[in-house]
Amino acid sequence: MAKEKIIGIDLGTTNSVVSVIEGGQPIILENPEGQRTTPSVVAFKNSDIIVGGAAKRQAVTNPNVVQSIKSKMGTTSKVNLEGKDYSPEQISAEILRYMKNYAEAKLGQKVTKAVITVPAYFNDAQRKATKDAGTIAGLQVERIINEPTAAALAYGLDKQDKEETILVYDLGGGTFDVSILAIGGGSFDVIATSGNNKLGGDNFDEEIIKWLLGKIKAEYNIDLSKEKMALQRLKDEAEKAKINLSSQLEVEINLPFIAMNESGPISFATTLTRSEFNKITKHLVDLTIQPVKDALSAAKKTPSEINEVLLVGGSTRIPAVQELVKSLLNKEPNRSINPDEVVAMGAAVQGGVLAGEVTDILLLDVTPLSLGIETMGGVMTKLIERNTTIPAKRTQIFSTATDNQPAVDINVLQGERAMAADNKSLGQFQLTGIQPAPRGIPQIEVTFEIDANGIVSVSAKDKNTNEEKTITISNSGNLSEAEVERMIKEAQENAANDEAKKKNIELKNKAENYINIIETSLLQAGDKISAEQKEQSQKMIDEIKELVKNENYEALEQKMAELEQAMAAAAEFANKHNDSDSNNNSSEQNN
């Protein structure tokens, strides 16, 4: 029995593609119409569901046609088709099911597993919606990966040992994304992203349509901008013209019987040159400049530090786009893989790795939720942020909360809330043997480490005694997707309230710390500080203690500012007194 394949799917806004590993290399699977790309269009007709080119051809005549559903993924919006509401996940599932079915027909075996790509900017809700669409389609989604990572995987098959910085310029049908990746030793890491989710090939088509409408109106004084049938024909011709102008300097556009006037049917014909096309779409090409600059800035890279530029998306075939990329980055972009297919091929590579068909590529994963510990006042202090690429290691120094504290309790937390109690506790342990010392003096080094399998190790070490305690947690990833999503959503909904709580606790901790410092300083200062200043400081300390006790944080903040002024004055007085004593001692020694 043949080993089960894991297919790679580029679920695009305009078109979708499916690929699989054969003989260690990714190949594209053609759909039943013999096409390597499938329009991401779904039509409902008399309860029949039609996907792809056949659905696209009904866009004008059939009101129950859905296009560009990807832009709605992760939202609560619904699409009403033939009197019934459908979620974006359900519509996307029809596209995925269609691709799953024809992949099975091509491969001659059952397909139940897939890797699906998403834009790098997709949030958790959008990623989860994509995975849910796969589940509805009968697919076990093994991994959701970023489109630029997939593109780099496809290009990186033959250069796994090189360390490079790669810029992926992805201009698709409906969105534009630019990503910068660090590649080396078979690992791929996205270090910066930018883009415009309302810019793509469709916008170029619209400019040609506007140009054609203007030509027709000028010649025949007819406005076709509200005529659906005519607009669909114009859209089809505009798309063809755009594609042909990538390889030709001019194209003929023929629209027989496009309209009627008092003289009868009107047939329209014109020529669109590449020069004119560049002129009417220049503003669209220019809109890609700033995202490229933003990505370079975020990655802290200059164009000269980019080793390679990859073009992704059918719209990168436009010569003006290629010229812009070349001038922006001072290098010829790599166009060796079909830009419409490269993302699906990369997804197939990742599927091949998971299926054991491709080796020597490190799969990077990320932490779904932040990890940290409970600190004074019940605050969650994060050491590893959500979406950190693993393996990862972070270390931070903490201290004791009370004088002569003999031990510290480490409560390991997972979640996004500001308060420890609102997050999930993964485990607890105690570090003992801390030598007696005033609060804040002992140095406790806490280290979080996550290996490639997602196993978390947390250690606490007393830097004075080298006493160390470690806990290993293997269930940090055992939350269901629903739980992860719920925790993220709760954090977003409670962000303002949580931040206010955290701020108040930090203010309280700061107040108690200052009180401790002042009381210790007053004790040590003895007669070096005036009785009046002692009385003033003690009065303020008592007032602050009362405010802390009553949780009057607004007044506490004001008093803290006064306390800091008093501390500064006390320090200045003590320094002057010390200088005076020093001078007196010096004079006595000289006599």
UniProtKB/Swiss-Prot annotation:
Keyword tRNA-binding applies: no
Induction cue: By stress conditions e.g. heat shock.
Modified residues (Phosphothreonine): T175
Low complexity compositional bias, start-end: 581-591
Keywords recorded for this protein, A-Z: ATP-binding, Chaperone, Nucleotide-binding, Phosphoprotein, Stress response
Pfam families (UniProt xref): HSP70
Region feature Disordered, mapped onto this chain: 570-591
MF terms in GO: ATP binding; ATP-dependent protein folding chaperone; unfolded protein binding
InterPro entries assigned: ATPase_NBD, Chaperone_DnaK, Heat_shock_70_CS, HSP70_peptide-bd_sf, Hsp_70_fam
Sequence similarity: Belongs to the heat shock protein 70 family.
Described function: Acts as a chaperone.
Xref: PANTHER family: HEAT SHOCK PROTEIN 70KDA (PTHR19375)
HAMAP family assigned to the protein according to its UniProt record, in alphabetical order: DnaK
Protein name: Chaperone protein DnaK
Source organism (scientific name): Mycoplasma capricolum subsp. capricolum (strain California kid / ATCC 27343 / NCTC 10154)
Lineage: Bacteria, Bacillati, Mycoplasmatota, Mollicutes, Mycoplasmataceae
Gene symbol of the encoding locus: dnaK
